[in-house]
From Swiss-Prot:
GO molecular function: D1 dopamine receptor binding
Residue(s) carrying Phosphotyrosine: Y791
Location of the region described as Interaction with SLC11A2 in the Swiss-Prot/TrEMBL record: 438-796
Record GO biological process: endocytic recycling; intracellular protein transport; mitochondrial fragmentation involved in apoptotic process; mitochondrion to lysosome vesicle-mediated transport; negative regulation of inflammatory response; negative regulation of late endosome to lysosome transport; neurotransmitter receptor transport, endosome to plasma membrane; positive regulation of dopamine receptor signaling pathway
Organism taxonomic ancestry: Eukaryota, Metazoa, Chordata, Craniata, Vertebrata
Oligomer status and interactors: Component of the heterotrimeric retromer cargo-selective complex (CSC), also described as vacuolar protein sorting subcomplex (VPS) formed by VPS26 (VPS26A or VPS26B), VPS29 and VPS35. The CSC has a highly elongated structure with VPS26 and VPS29 binding independently at opposite distal ends of VPS35 as central platform. The CSC is believed to associate with variable sorting nexins to form functionally distinct retromer complex variants.
Protein name: Vacuolar protein sorting-associated protein 35
Residues annotated with Phosphoserine modification: S7, S783
Family: Belongs to the VPS35 family.
Gene: VPS35
Membrane topology according to the record: Peripheral membrane protein
Entry GO CC: cytosol; early endosome; endosome; endosome membrane; late endosome; lysosome; mitochondrion; mitochondrion-derived vesicle
Length: 796
């Protein structure tokens, strides 16, 4: 029966299982012999057990498991030997003896085990034995077996390496220099073995070998960890011996995987203080690394680590004699220079780290930040980059770069001090410029940054011009209406932050802003010009407040209203009607309230402009009713007109109301006009209400007449009730022309018509309205106010 093919994983598990079983058998025998004090037999079983490590069949992962199992058993042997030597057994004989083991792998593992025990028992032999052991390990040149053997040597000697602060006889026991030499040599040899792994086996297994090498890298890195743990390794020794030795090995091995891992290892395991004193040699080595090494990640890791160190509250910070930013700036430039094929996004990533470093270590040095931006501009010029696509990696990195100053300063005015910020902005394509412009404006709004001068306004407007004016590179298709409205609302809100303490300066700021916004095209100005008009009205009120200290305030107010008029006119040219109409009405109110010289003329002009817009531009009946109601409401609040101007305006309102297309609209507008003849005010009566009772009655009678002409019965009754409420209002305001008889007639009319309406939700609403009106009258009749009219004779 044919056997089924095993998967590589199953094969590995089977081989490992067999090896572990053999280890268990031999270790059991070894321990039995040790318990019976049969040392020679025990060593024979130990040698057999170690023979399992001679295999070439296991993957690094499986070999590691086997190695760990054997290491644990060897520890038992080490403890036994230590006890024996303490009792007086001769070590020298044993050290000689294990050298006769048949195979080199078992022999060297046993030599290390015995050698370590020897050193612990007789420290005076330490220097020679350590040298002996590290040299002997050269005997195993198979990468996998050699790496684990040397790792065993490193682990076993962990606690016996000479270090600072212990009494020593340097001739025999060695000193810190011997420890550094020992670990550096072991590191160099392990790195060579590790690098050599890539050349073993078939080229088709290359990817698998690279994966296996990745798994084994920690064995090589452990040497660097060991060096960093030696107390005797101070800054001076690190600079002169340790780093020099490591970098020499790293640069010379010419292997990208090893170089990248070991450089990152150096950054991680040694203290920040050491890195600060050795920046130049480390960064110079970066420039010499293999072309396939991702140098960017190495440099960024170092920069980020030192930036954190500088930022630590409890730390000493960066020593003043170390020009950290300058060193990194120069060395990063050298690295970029030495790597012509470095991807553009990696080049920008390095600048991102540099700018982070400048921000964290030198928060007050705006020039350092600008230096990074300038370098980036120069790099882009060399690469002939322009309009970088939003989707590209370079665009993402450039976005990160430019967001850092925005987020760190949280003040656009500081960002504007960076001369190279705007030039870099221009490298983006349309989409990226637009999203970055939104980002900048959102930051201004979030932090309420006030823009206080014309130059600042100019600079910001130019920076975010993608939101303010059409661009040559913008897409042909129309933008999404919602997105467009959101972007423009952002700009509109920003206008309210253009404010100077000095009113004259504020006027110049608004003028500058209008120049930019005026060129925005019809779609944009409906969002951007109205806030500008309101800002102008606010400024006019400020001049009024300053009238005691500024004798030219009235002329300045006229100038402001002229500015507002021009700005609103631009909206009319953009074929907008309702928006400019509202702005003219607001202007008329403002002019009337401020009361500067010529204010009546200005207010009249603004009112008549609103009328012109109403008559010429608004044709939709709903919009017409809303507009005339607004005009009447605004005019009713104004008290700056003489009778000469007030009379034609109120007549005009009444006329316009009666000319509305739909009868219900006419009725409502005409009845609203009644208020103009009652509570309207002019200068001839010193601002007191007109109280023209007769004209009020004329309006209300006309409204009733119009309501009578309505064909829809429910609409007709509804209008009657609304007009009844107007009558009641004026009766309570003590208009003599409105009598109880008039009220009774209208109530009777409504009572007659209501039952004829078809049953519906609308009819229910009408009934409710009428009921509420009668309830009001009932309450007034039963408990009349002392000053109010008496409802005597009212029939309810």
């Amino acid at each position: 029966m044919p056997t089924t093919q095993q998967s590589p994983q199953d094969e590995q598990e089977k081989l490992l299982d067999e090896a572990i079983q053999a280890v268990k058998v031999q270790s059991f025998q070894m321990k039995r012999c040790l318990d019976k004090n049969k040392l020679m037999d025990a060593l024979k079983h130990a040698s057999n057990m170690l023979g399992e490590l001679r295999t070439s069949m296991l993957s690094p992962k499986s070999y590691y498991e086997l190695y760990m199992a054997i290491s644990d058993e060897l520890h038992y042997l080490e403890v036994y030997l230590t006890d024996e030597f303490a009792k007086g057994r001769k070590v020298a004989d044993l050290y000689e003896l294990v050298q006769y083991a048949g195979n080199i792998i078992p022999r060297l593992y046993l030599l290390i085990t015995v050698g370590v025990v020897y050193v612990k028992s007789f420290p005076q032999s330490r220097k020679d034995i350590l040298k002996d052991l590290v040299e002997m390990c050269r005997g195993v040149q198979h990468p996998l077996r050699g790496l684990f053997l040397r790792n065993y040597l490193l682990q076993c000697t962990r606690n016996i390496l000479p270090d600072e602060g212990e009494p020593t006889d340097e001739e025999t026991t060695g000193d810190i220099s011997d420890s550094m030499d020992f670990v550096l040599l072991n590191f160099a040899e392990m790195n060579k073995l590790w690098v050599r792994m890539q050349h073993q086996g078939h080229s088709r297994d290359r990817e698998k070998r690279e994966r296996e090498r990745q798994e084994l890298r920690i064995l090589v890195g452990t040497n660097l960890v060991r060096l960093s743990q030696l107390e005797g390794v101070n800054v001076e020794r690190y600079k002169q011996i340790v780093l020099t030795g490591i970098l020499e090995q790293v640069v010379n091995c010419r292997d990208a995987l090893a170089q990248e891992y070991l450089m990152e290892c150096i950054i991680q395991v040694f203290p920040d203080e050491f890195h600060l004193q050795t920046l130049n040699p480390f960064l110079r080595a970066c420039a010499e690394l293999h072309q396939n090494v991702n140098v960017k990640n190495i440099i960024i890791a170092l920069i980020d680590r030192l930036a954190l160190f500088a930022h630590r509250e409890d730390g000493p910070g960066i020593p003043t004699d170390i020009k950290l930013f300058d060193i990194f700036s120069q060395q990063v430039a050298t690295v970029i220079q030495s790597r012509q094929d470095m991807p553009s996004e990696d080049v920008v990533s390095l600048q991102v780290s540099l700018i982070n470093l400048a921000m964290k270590c030198y928060p007050d040095r705006v020039d350092y930040v600008d230096k990074v931006l300038e370098t980036t501009v120069e790099i882009f010029n060399k690469l002939n980059l322009e309009h970088i696509a939003t989707s590209s990696a370079v665009s993402k990195e450039l976005t990160r770069l430019l967001k850092i100053p925005v987020d760190t300063y949280n003040n656009i005015l500081t960002v504007l001090k960076l001369k190279h910020f705007h030039p870099l902005f221009e490298y983006f394509d349309y989409e990226s410029r637009k999203s970055m412009s939104c980002y900048v404006l959102s930051n201004v709004l979030d932090y309420n940054t006030e823009i206080v001068s014309q130059d600042q306004v100019d600079s910001i407007m130019n920076l975010v011009s993608t939101l303010i004016q059409d661009q040559p590179d913008q897409p042909v298709e129309e933008p999404d209406p919602e997105d467009f409205a959101d972007e423009q609302s952002l700009v509109g809100r920003f206008i309210h932050l253009l404010r100077s303490e000095d009113p004259d300066q504020q006027y110049l700021i608004l003028n500058t802003a209008r120049k930019h916004f005026g060129a925005g095209g019809n779609q944009r100005i409906r969002f951007t010009l109205p806030p500008l008009v309101f800002a102008a009205y606010q400024l006019a009120f400020r001049y009024k407040e300053n009238s005691k200290v500024d004798d030219k305030w009235e002329k300045k107010c006229q100038k402001i209203f002229s500015f507002a008029h021009q700005t609103i006119s631009a909206l009319i040219k953009a074929e907008l009607a309702e928006l400019p109409l509202r702005l003219f009405l607001q202007g008329a109110l403002a002019a009337g309230e401020i009361g500067f010289e010529n204010h009546e003329t200005v207010a009249y002009e603004f009112m008549s402009q609103a009328f012109s817009l109403y008559e010429d531009e608004i044709s939709d009946s709903k919009a017409q009713l809303a507009a005339i109601t607004l005009i009447i409401g605004t005019f009713e609040r104004m008290k700056c007109f003489s009778e000469e101007n007030h009379e034609p305006l109120r007549t005009q309102c009444a006329l316009a109301a009666s000319k509305l297309l739909k009868k219900p609209d006419q009725g409502r507008a005409v009845s609203t006009c009644a208020h103009l003849f009652w509570s309207g005010r002019n200068t001839d009566k010193n601002g007191e209400e007109l109280h023209g009772g007769k004209r009020v009655m004329e309006c209300l009678k006309k409204a009733l007449k119009i309501a009578n002409q309505c064909m829809d019965p429910s609409l007709q009754v509804q209008l009657f009730i609304e007009i009844l409420n107007r009558y009641i209002y004026f009766y309570e305001k003590e208009n003599d022309a409105v009598t109880i008889q008039v009220l009774n007639q209208l109530i009777q009319k409504i009572r007659e018509d209501l039952p004829n309406l078809e049953s519906s939700e609308e009819t229910e609403q009408i009934n409710k309205h009428f009921h509420n009106t009668l309830e009001h009258l009932r309450l007034r009749r039963e408990s009349p106010e002392s000053e109010g009219p008496i409802y005597e004779g009212l029939i309810l």
